[in-house]
Amino acid sequence: MCGIIGIIGNDEVAPRLVDALKRLEYRGYDSAGIATLQNGRLDRRRAEGKLVNLEKRLAGEPLPGVIGIGHTRWATHGRPVERNAHPHITTRLAVVHNGIIENFAELRAMLEAEGRKFETETDTEAVAHLVTRELEKGKSPVEAVRDCLPHLKGAFALAFLFEGDEELLIGARQGPPLAVGYGEGEMFLGSDAIALAPFTDTISYLEDGDWAVLTRNGVSIYDENNKPVERPVQKSQNTNMLVSKGNHRHFMQKEMFEQPEVISHTLANYLDFTTGKVRKEAIGIDFSKVDRLTITACGTAYYAATVAKYWFEQIARLPVDSDIASEFRYREMPLSKDSLAMFVSQSGETADTLASLRYCKAQGLKIASVVNVTGSTIARESDAVFPTLAGPEIGVASTKAFTCQLSAMASLAIAAARARGAIDEVREQELVHQLSEAPRFINQVLKLEDQIAAVCHDLSKVNHVLYLGRGTSFPLAMEGALKLKEISYIHAEGYAAGELKHGPIALIDETMPVIVIAPSDRLYEKTVSNMQEVAARGGRIILITDKKGAESASIDTMATIVLPEVPEFISPLVYALPIQMLAYHTAVLMGTDVDQPRNLAKSVTVE
C-alpha cells in the first residue's frame, strides 16, 4: 500500500527519493512527499495527487540535502489531501509510515491532554509526537524510538529522520515489509527491492518487531526485545530492473503480452517437457501424506486458488477448501495435522493471507506458499515455496501473476495426482504436454486483441455487467467481473451459470450485457441452456468460446469471441486472456487510470 524510501547518501537526495517513489507508484497512492536535512535543518515538500505534482513543487521550491525520506500515501486515516500527506514533521523529527496504528485515538488523546497540537487527521502524527515527547526528555533518537515502539499497536513500517543529525535514519517494522539496502558509503530503507533497485542490489529484510539504526557506514538491527540481531543479506532479484512500458500504452497491456513467456518460465520450473514428468525436486512435498488441502488467498489470487480447487479435486482426488483469507482467519475452521495449508499471494506480503498462514502454523500444519516474491514474508515463513516466475508486475490489476499462479498450481495438481496414485505415468505425460502447449494457445489469443477491443465500445457505455461460467469457468467469471470493476469502475458480478435462476436472472433486460465464458467442454450444453434463458429476456450476450462452441450455440449474440480449441485442463489459462483484454480496453475507452485505478493498492499490507 503506502511506499517508503529513506536514503543516507553522498549526492543530492531529492531526485533520488522521487525516482524511488516512482518505482513505488504501482502500490497505489493518492499523495506523496519527501523530507531532507540541510545544515541540520528539516524541510519537506508534499503534494496531493500524482508524483508529477510533487515534481512541479520541487522544481519551484528545491529541497537540498544528502539525507532524506520519502513516501507515497494510500489514505487510511484522514482524507487524501496535502495536509495529511507524509512526511509528518515536528520540531525534532520527520516520519513516514505504512500501516495502521490501531491505538492512535488513545495516543492522540493523551498527547493532546499534554498540550501537543495536531495538524492532521492521520494516525501517523501520533507517532511523530510520541517520539518527540521522548526526545524532549533528553533521550537520544535511538532511545526515543526504542522506548516508543512498544506503545504502538497495529501494523506499521516506519522511517525516521532527525533534526540536527545528518548521519542517522531509523526504521522499524511490525507487519508491512521494510528492507535495508547496502551501498558504498551510503545506506537505504525501502518498502521493497523495486524501490531500492536503482541504488543497490544488496538488501536485508527486517523481521516483525525489528528496528534498524542506519548510518552512512552500516546498520545495526535489533529485535523486539532490543537485542542485536543479524538478518540475512541477499541479492535482489529486481536489480537493474527497467520499469518501462516499452511500446505499450500501459503496464497492464505490456504485462498481458508477457504472459506466454512468463508462463513458459513458470511451467519449466516444475515440469520436464522432455520426459513429460513433474520435476520432483521442485515440489518438496509428499502429497501422498496429505489428506486435505486448504488454499487461502485474497482478490485475484483467491480466484486462482478456486480454479486450483477444481484441479486438485478432479485430477488428484484430493479434497480442497479454497478460502478468502480475511474470512478464514476468523472462522475457527477445524484443521487436521495431516492437512496442507497453501497460501497464494503475488507480493507475499498480503496482510490477511499472512495472518491466516500464522494461524495455521500455530495449529501445527505444514505450510506451502505460491508467491511471486521469493524474499517476501509469506515465503520466508513457509515450509515449501512455489515461485511464480512472472517478474515484477506493476499494473495494480493482476494479469501475468494470475496466470502464473494458475500455472504453478496446475503443475502441483499433477504432482499431487501422481504421488497419490490418482493418475498413471501416461496420464501425467498427457497433462504435462497439455500445459506445455498453453503459451502457444495464449499467443494465438493475443492476436485477437483488435477484435476484442471492438467489443468494448458497447461495454464502455453500460453501468452493469454480468459474467457467467461453469466449472473452472466460474472462478474465471468472478475474476473477469473483478477486473472490469477494478479498472473501468463499471459494476460487474460473476456467477456460476447454474445459479442464474436463483436470483441474477431478475437483473436481465435489454440493457444488461452478459459475458458467458463457455469452452466446448462437457458442461457446454448446460451453459447454452442458461444463455437461452438470457436471450429470452433480451439480455445482450457476449460469448467467449471456441469454434465448435460458436457453431453449435444457435443463439443471437452481441458478440462472439472465438478462441482456439484447447483441452479442458488448460482452458482457464487460455480463457483468462480475453477477460483481461475486455476489462483493459473498456477502461481505456472510459479514460480511467488503468495502471493505478482509484482507491486500489497493489500490495495490501494492512487488514
From Swiss-Prot:
It comes from the Bacteria. InterPro entries: GATase_2_dom, GFAT, GFAT_N, GlmS/AgaS_SIS, GlmS/FrlB_SIS, Ntn_hydrolases_N, SIS_dom, SIS_dom_sf. GO terms for cellular component: cytosol. The active site is at C2 (nucleophile), K602 (for fru-6p isomerization activity). Its EC number is 2.6.1.16. Gene3D superfamilies: Glucose-6-phosphate isomerase like protein, domain 1, Glutamine Phosphoribosylpyrophosphate, subunit 1, domain 1. Transmembrane segments: none annotated. GO terms for biological process: carbohydrate metabolic process; fructose 6-phosphate metabolic process; protein N-linked glycosylation; UDP-N-acetylglucosamine metabolic process. Keywords: Aminotransferase, Cytoplasm, Glutamine amidotransferase, Repeat, Transferase. Its main location: cytoplasm. Residues 283-422, 455-597 form the SIS domain. It holds the Pfam family SIS. Disulfide bonds: none annotated. Residues 2-217 form the Glutamine amidotransferase type-2 domain. It is an enzyme of class 2 (transferase). It catalyses: D-fructose 6-phosphate + L-glutamine = D-glucosamine 6-phosphate + L-glutamate. Catalyzes the first step in hexosamine metabolism, converting fructose-6P into glucosamine-6P using glutamine as a nitrogen source. Homodimer. This is Glutamine--fructose-6-phosphate aminotransferase [isomerizing]. The gene is glmS.
